[in-house]
Amino acid sequence: MSTLALIVEDDEDLASIFAEALHGVGFTVEHVTDGRSAEERLKKGDPPFLILLDMHIPHVSGGDLLVNVIKKEEHLAKTMVIITTADARMGETYGEMADFVLIKPISFVQLRDLTSRLKPKDA
């Protein structure tokens, strides 16, 4: 089973922290910085096991990406989604479409511990 995690985050420093936490528990990581790039990546190529999705990203919002791509593309049906946002109301709005909601600021340890529990056992 794939252990690919796609980080959709426009803050490069935060994306680096996320990538380090995911690498630390055995995930392979790809990173895109905006919704348009994420949409292109998700519509072609192998589906990731996990998407770490910032809700406030340029070009196509995380909410639009979640509603119009992630939840509509059949090949992404088994992809786990963790949304990240500093806006608790946005987390509530989209929370039912995601597997987890993390409210920023998110610590390295918090993300590492969560993703280590989500990683496929056979990976």
Which residue ranges define each predicted feature?
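Two-component/phosphorelay signaling modules centered on CheY-like receiver
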Residues: 11-30, 100
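The feature encodes the CheY-like receiver
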Residues: 58-60
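Conserved acidic carboxylate
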Residues: 9, 85
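The C-terminal output helix
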Residues: 116-123
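Active-site residues of response regulator receiver
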Residues: 54-56
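Alpha4 helix (beta4-alpha4-beta5 surface) of REC/receiver domains from two-component response regulators
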Residues: 64, 86-103, 109, 113
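Acidic, metal-coordinating helix/loop segments flanking the phosphotransfer/catalytic sites
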Residues: 31-50
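Short amphipathic alpha-helix used as the core "switch/output" element in two-component signaling
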Residues: 64-77
